[in-house]
């Protein structure tokens, strides 16, 4: 594993130094099976699980036998709320449930690092000093800058939580998804063609990742 070095791009079209991407985060082996498991678990946990149907015991009415047992020539019936009646209860229908799956933190971290490594190897990670020059938000400037970085349509923009200027500038751009460094996850990385980090967000993410690794070793 080797550290990767990326130039820091500016909104003016120049470079402002470079940053190193640690190999333990951005040059890891990719396990497709692990990515699949973690993404499925993340999507499952996002489900509300509030779906609910009524059984024959919960549907209003149907307490009286609709007609006598014998002598009508019809099949015997005990309630008009049985599942085979229109307006009857639902048999084996969905009930509220929790879809969350237990996924170990080490697996979640390994999947995220694998997804980032895949994007880094394919030169789909970019680092910028700031999205928009100056103090005023500008969607036009943000759009032009991102289009200069990549021609692909789906972009994940990772910025600092306090970078309100960048948030307002990119909030309405189609194909651009905004996350803070501590919100970075496997699904959003894989769902985007390119990842654009601000220098601040990149350092925050790396510090959190390396700090957590040191705590685990201790």
Swiss-Prot record:
Transmembrane segments: none annotated. This is Large ribosomal subunit protein uL4. Residues 62-73 have a biased composition (Basic residues). Pfam families: Ribosomal_L4 (PF00573). One of its GO terms (molecular function) is structural constituent of ribosome. It comes from the Bacteria. Keywords: Ribonucleoprotein, Ribosomal protein, RNA-binding, rRNA-binding. The gene is rplD. InterPro entries: Ribosomal_uL4, Ribosomal_uL4-like, Ribosomal_uL4_dom_sf. One of the primary rRNA binding proteins, this protein initially binds near the 5'-end of the 23S rRNA. It is important during the early stages of 50S assembly. It makes multiple contacts with different domains of the 23S rRNA in the assembled 50S subunit and ribosome. Residues 46-100 are annotated as: Disordered. Part of the 50S ribosomal subunit. NCBIfam families: rplD_bact. GO terms for cellular component: ribonucleoprotein complex; ribosome. GO terms for biological process: translation. PANTHER family: 50S RIBOSOMAL PROTEIN L4 (PTHR10746), LARGE RIBOSOMAL SUBUNIT PROTEIN UL4M (PTHR10746:SF6). Belongs to the universal ribosomal protein uL4 family.
């Amino acid at each position: 594993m080797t550290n990767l070095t990326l130039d820091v791009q500016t909104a003016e079209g120049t470079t402002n130094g470079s940053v190193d991407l640690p190999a333990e985060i951005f040059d890891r082996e990719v396990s497709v099976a692990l990515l699949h498991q973690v993404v499925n678990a993340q999507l499952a946990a996002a489900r509300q699980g509030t779906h609910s149907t009524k059984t024959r015991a919960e549907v209003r009415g149907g307490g009286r036998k609709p007609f006598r047992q014998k002598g009508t020539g019809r099949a015997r019936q005990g309630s008009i709320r049985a599942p085979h009646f229109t307006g009857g209860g639902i048999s084996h229908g969905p009930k509220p449930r929790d879809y969350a799956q237990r996924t170990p933190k080490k697996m979640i971290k390994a999947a995220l690092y694998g997804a980032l490594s895949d994007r880094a190897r394919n030169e789909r990670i970019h680092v910028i000093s700031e999205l928009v020059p100056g103090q005023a938000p500008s969607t036009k400037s943000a759009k032009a800058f991102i289009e200069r970085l990549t021609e692909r349509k789906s972009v994940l923009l990772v910025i600092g939580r306090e970078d309100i200027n960048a948030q307002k500038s990119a909030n309405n751009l189609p194909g651009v998804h905004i996350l803070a460094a501590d919100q970075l996850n496997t699904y959003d990385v894989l769902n985007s063609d390119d990842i654009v980090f601000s220098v601040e967000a990149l350092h925050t993410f790396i510090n959190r990742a390396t700090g957590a690794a040191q705590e685990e070793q201790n």
